[in-house]
């Protein structure tokens, strides 16, 4: 029996302190800690979700937001199928940096039709809020992004956020049903190498991902 139908790489970007790691830990492990330290470098989690009877494995990369790590994290844009931009609704600067920094990085390093999601985190801090939902929705609409407000602390809309981008990716793939590739092999197969569709014996990517202009960076 196949383990999953699709494997997608998603990266989570945004300023340090916006709660990227907390969102990922809440989604992947259902845990939350007030004392979680800022990510140094890059870490990732794997989570399998079921959408419309399709099993999707998400490989989610948690990138460091600090400026000094920007040269490290930029290498992870290539091959990403989806990108989640996170800002803190109580921190206007983190929101401004979405357009001033992070979306510019996406344009520079990611594929042109990568799926994007904007998350306004920390909505549990309503009294300290400085970024309105309307402001964020405007930015999302201008940049062809879905928008969701969430709280890693209270677990509000966290699963919805990640499943939203997973569904968007699945819908992109299934736009080309006649070219849909066969089911992928297990991640535990040591002899395999990673590609956009999962793992394969050779550096050959499926035609559906070529149509989507996705490159894993392994077959160049």
Swiss-Prot record:
UniProt entry tagged with the keyword Magnesium: no
PROSITE patterns linked: RAB
Localization, UniProt: Cell membrane
InterPro entries: P-loop_NTPase, Small_GTP-bd, Small_GTPase, Small_GTPase_Rab
GO biological process: protein transport
Short sequence motif Effector region: positions: 36-44
Main location: membrane
Keyword entries, A-Z: Cell membrane, GTP-binding, Lipoprotein, Membrane, Nucleotide-binding, Prenylation, Protein transport, Transport
GO cellular component: plasma membrane
Keyword S-adenosyl-L-methionine carried by entry: no
Membrane topology: Lipid-anchor
Pfam families per the UniProt record, alphabetical: Ras
Highest taxon above the source species: Eukaryota
Binding site for GTP: 14-21, 62-66, 121-124
GO molecular function: GTP binding; GTPase activity
Lipid-modified residues, S-geranylgeranyl cysteine kind: 219
NCBIfam families, per the entry: small_GTP
Family: Belongs to the small GTPase superfamily. Rab family.
Function according to Swiss-Prot or TrEMBL: Protein transport. Probably involved in vesicular traffic from ER to Golgi.
The name this protein goes by in its record: Ras-related protein Rab-1
Organism per entry: Theileria parva (East coast fever infection agent)
């Amino acid at each position: 029996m196949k383990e999953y139908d699709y494997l997608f790489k998603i990266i989570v970007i945004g300023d340090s302190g916006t709660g990227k790691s907390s969102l990922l830990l809440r989604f992947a492990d259902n845990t939350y800690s007030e004392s979680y330290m800022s990510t140094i470098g890059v870490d990732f989690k794997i989570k399998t979700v079921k959408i419309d009877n399709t099993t999707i494995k998400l490989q989610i990369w948690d990138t460091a937001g600090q400026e000094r790590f920007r040269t490290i994290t930029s290498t992870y844009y290539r091959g990403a199928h989806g990108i989640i931009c996170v800002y803190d609704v109580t921190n206007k600067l983190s929101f401004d940096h979405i357009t001033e920094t992070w979306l510019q990085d996406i344009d520079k390093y990611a594929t042109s039709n990568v799926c994007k999601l904007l998350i306004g985190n920390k909505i549990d801090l309503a009294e300290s809020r400085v970024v309105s939902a309307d402001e964020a929705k405007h930015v999302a609409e201008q940049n062809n992004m879905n928008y969701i407000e969430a709280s890693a602390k209270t677990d509000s809309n966290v699963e919805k956020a990640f499943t939203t981008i997973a569904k968007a990716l699945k819908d992109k793939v299934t736009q080309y049903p006649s070219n849909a590739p066969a089911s992928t092999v297990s991640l535990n197969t040591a002899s395999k190498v990673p590609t956009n569709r999962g793992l394969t014996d050779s550096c050959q990517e499926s035609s559906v991902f070529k149509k989507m202009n996705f490159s894993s960076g392994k077959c160049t």
